[in-house]
């Protein structure tokens, strides 16, 4: 009688460092996607580093492509140079090594010229919507994601002021 040998790959834990990418248009329409494992949980693109030495911009571009089908290299990906540290929800801690309860998240923005077609990864997300930034901030399940969307409006206004001042047009 032949025995059946099964091989289980060892559990690969998530690295507790991630990115959040607010995808938006110049007129501040924001793309939100709904998680497949949590109906009603709307969010921006998020994801963890695949390796400790993976550059953050590479992680951001990879996650955008995986979750939406959008190729970040075709548009303007900006590192917001903003980092937060938050407690990992208890229901998701099993994805991390024992004792890991906090995650460091780096914020990025991806500006597309208009709402672009989205191809969702059905195992991760079930629906998407382009919303005005205020409505998007209200829809976000996570308070930190909502804050990132609210910062988008501030960053856009600050960027316009910087460009005006640099051009010598300020009065």
Name each model feature, range by range.
Residues 5-30, 52:
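Conserved N-terminal beta-strand and adjoining loop/helix that marks the start
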Residues 16, 44, 101-105:
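Short connector loops at helix/strand junctions that flank enzyme active sites
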Residues 25-73:
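Conserved Nudix-box catalytic region and its N-terminal flanking loop in Nudix hydrolases
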Residues 71-83:
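A short coil-to-beta-strand element that immediately follows conserved catalytic motifs
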Residues 81-117, 129:
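Active-site-adjacent beta-strand/loop module that shapes the phosphate/pyrophosphate-binding cleft
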Residues 106-150:
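NUDIX/MutT-family hydrolases
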Residues 137-171:
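Charged phosphate-binding loop/patch that engages nucleotide di/tri-phosphates or the phosphate backbone
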């Amino acid at each position: 009688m032949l025995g059946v040998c099964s091989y289980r790959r060892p559990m690969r834990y998530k690295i507790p460092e991630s990115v959040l990418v607010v995808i938006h248009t110049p007129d501040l329409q924001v793309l939100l996607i709904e998680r497949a494992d949590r109906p009603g949980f709307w969010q921006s693109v998020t994801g963890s580093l695949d390796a400790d030495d993976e550059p953050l911009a590479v992680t951001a571009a990879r996650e955008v492509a995986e979750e939406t089908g959008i190729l970040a290299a075709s548009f303007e990906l900006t590192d917001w140079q903003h980092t937060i540290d938050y407690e990992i929800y208890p229901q998701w801690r099993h994805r991390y090594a024992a004792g890991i309860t906090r995650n460091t998240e780096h914020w990025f923005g991806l500006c597309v010229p208009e709402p672009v077609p989205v191809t969702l990864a059905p195992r991760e997300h079930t629906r998407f919507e382009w919303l005005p930034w205020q409505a998007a901030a209200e829809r976000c399940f996570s308070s930190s994601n909502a804050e990132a969307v609210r910062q988008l409006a501030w960053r856009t206004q600050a960027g316009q002021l910087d460009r005006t001042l640099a051009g010598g047009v300020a009065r």
